[in-house]
């Protein structure tokens, strides 16, 4: 919820310098809650707000970042040199057409569940649970989607359309993990690290959202190519 400082200052007297009344009046801090300490500071009140889920968000975002780096830099598993090898049985995840479809649609389902965060953020009728916990939920499903990505691809980027789909998905997770780390630090309130994170986190979040838009198109053509080519 984007609310200018001028709007908040104009409402201070009306809301009797009460952070809760100011939040109710202007809707500031009612989405993610990370700016609650700033609202209390503006009202001259003692900062009592403890950011919800910040520690969990930081931990899971770091795990997600590590998972993304593994996806990018880890070599794909070697191929089996014998049908009797255990690797040959594992390879069926990436060779068998039916298994590939199962893992692919499972990955898509996990990804879609993770998008529930957008409903919580953008629609007033969807207010179940605190946004901070939804953000942690979103991060956890990002990690699960990377695990599913390995099961589906073996971390092989492929070529042409498959490469760009994989690249976009991995980059989306990379930006999401970075935005999650910055959001967790931002929740610390008014420390220098929090102010630094608050300055750059919106750009990471915006880039994360922009990078999402090509994904449905790439995914659609990927699915069509499986069945028609």
Locate predicted features.
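Regular secondary-structure segments
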Residues: 9-13, 151
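Local cysteine-cluster metal-coordination motifs and their immediate loop/turn environment
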Residues: 1-9, 24-44
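Short, charged, surface-exposed loops that flank catalytic or proteolytic processing sites
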Residues: 14-19
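C-terminal lid/capping helical subdomain adjacent to the catalytic/cofactor pocket in oxidative enzymes
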Residues: 5, 46, 62-64
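Generic alpha-helical secondary structure signal
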Residues: 6, 20, 37, 191-198
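Flexible metal-binding regulatory segments at protein termini and peripheral loops
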Residues: 20-27, 39-60
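Short, flexible active-site loop motifs that bind/organize anionic cofactors or intermediates
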Residues: 12, 25, 202
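Membrane-embedded alpha-helical bundles that constitute the cytochrome b-like, heme-associated redox core
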Residues: 51-229
């Amino acid at each position: 919820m984007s609310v200018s400082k001028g709007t908040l200052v104009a409402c201070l007297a009306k809301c009797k310098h009460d952070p809760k009344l100011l939040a109710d009046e202007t809707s500031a801090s009612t989405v993610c809650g990370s700016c609650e300490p700033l609202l209390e500071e503006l009202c001259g009140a003692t900062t009592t707000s403890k950011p919800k889920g910040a520690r969990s968000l930081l931990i899971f975002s770091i795990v997600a970042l590590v998972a993304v780096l593994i996806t990018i830099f880890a070599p794909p598993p070697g191929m089996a040199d014998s049908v009797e090898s255990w690797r040959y049985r594992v390879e069926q995840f990436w060779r068998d057409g039916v298994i590939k479809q199962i893992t692919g649609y499972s990955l898509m389902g996990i990804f879609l569940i993770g998008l529930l965060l957008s409903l919580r953020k953008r629609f007033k009728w969807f207010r179940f649970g605190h946004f901070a916990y939804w953000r942690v939920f979103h991060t956890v499903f990002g990690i699960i989607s990377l695990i599913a990505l390995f099961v589906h691809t073996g971390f092989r980027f492929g070529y042409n359309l498959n490469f760009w789909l994989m690249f976009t998905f991995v980059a989306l997770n990379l930006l999401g993990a970075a935005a999650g780390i910055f959001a967790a630090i931002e929740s610390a309130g008014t420390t220098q690290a929090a102010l630094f994170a608050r300055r750059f986190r919106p750009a990471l979040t915006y880039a994360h959202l922009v990078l999402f838009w090509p994904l449905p198109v790439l995914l659609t053509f990927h699915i069509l190519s499986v069945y028609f080519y």
